[in-house]
Amino acid sequence: MMNLLNKSLEENGSVLTAFYIFVAFVALYLLGRALQAFVQAADACCLFWYTWVVVPGAKGTTFVYKHTYGKKLNKPELETVIVNEFPKNGWKQ
C-alpha cells in the first residue's frame, strides 16, 4: 500500500494524490449508500411478501382446515373406521 502511495506521489505530486485518495473515499461512501439502499429495498420486498402472501396464506390454510378437516364428522361409524383402520403416525399398532 505504501509502495503504491509513494509511486503516486512521485508520478503525480501530492495534490493530485490527495485528490485521488479523496475520490476513493467518496466512491466508497457512495458504494455504501448504494448497498444500504439495496438492503432497504430487499427488506421492504421481504416485508411485503410476508405481509401479503405468507400471513394470509397461513390464515387461509388454517381457515380451510378448521372448516373442512378439523370439523367433527358427527358420524360415529365412520370415525371408528378412520381411527381403527388407518395407521397412527405411519405405523400400525
UniProtKB/Swiss-Prot annotation:
Residues 33-93 are intravirion. It comes from the Viruses. GO terms for biological process: disruption of cellular anatomical structure in another organism; viral budding from Golgi membrane. Its main location: host cell. Residues 1-11 are virion surface. The chain crosses the membrane at residues 12-32. It is found in: Host Golgi apparatus membrane. The keyword Metal-binding does not apply. It is a single-pass type III membrane protein. InterPro entries: E_protein_CoV, IBV_3C. Keywords: Apoptosis, Host Golgi apparatus, Host membrane, Membrane, Transmembrane, Transmembrane helix. One of its GO terms (cellular component) is membrane. Plays a central role in virus morphogenesis and assembly. Acts as a viroporin and self-assembles in host membranes forming pentameric protein-lipid pores that allow ion transport. Also plays a role in the induction of apoptosis. Belongs to the gammacoronaviruses E protein family. Homooligomer. Interacts with the M membrane protein in the budding compartment of the host cell, which is located between endoplasmic reticulum and the Golgi complex. The cytoplasmic tails of both proteins are important for this function. Interacts with Nucleoprotein. This is Envelope small membrane protein. It comes from Avian infectious bronchitis virus (strain Portugal/322/82).
